[in-house]
Amino acid sequence: TKGTKMSKKALILTWESYQDHEVVYPFYRVQEEGFEVDIMANKLGRIFGILGTYNECTQSVFDLDDEKLFEKHMNDYDLLIIPGGVKALEYLRQQQNALRFIKEWDTKKKTIACICHGAQLLISSKITSGRDVSGYYSIKDDISNSGANYVDGPAVISNNLVSCPHYKWMGQWMKAVFEVYESGNG
């Protein structure tokens, strides 16, 4: 309702040169479900995807280096979205506190929505072992070698984690994300 504050908050964790579809669609889709949404990346303000679209980044990934801000972000958000983008993930997976954030988020059983190369962050966060995980076909071996069971499906659910291999299945993926979120598995 207009004028009332939304209570649910989603955080999209990415870096410049993200896969455009995988940021733009979830950004608007979560708002349709009543979430406020912020993008956390390597710089504040306008950031660009690999196809040239842009979004406004309102949170800095470097905030996670400050323990008070780390905890604030952990407590402020209800849903974590990890989009793909090969170059973006190469940089983001080098940010140790971003990886620690994902691991702690998972430990708290909060919902994680991950798509395409975003699975590389799951691997680097060491949360894939023993789980069903999907991701882009070119990282299938990486997913399997991390101890996960690679599943090539549009919306792979493993407890609080919902993963997807490709943006062509974003509709099914986001539907599953909201089901997991609402069920309390996240």
Language model region names:
Residues G3-K108, Q120-G130, K140-G186:
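Extended, subdomain-level signal for the structured scaffold at the beginning of enzyme domains
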Residues C114-G118:
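Short, thiol/selenol-centered motifs that function as redox-active sites or metal-ligating centers
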Residues V133:
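Anionic-ligand binding patches
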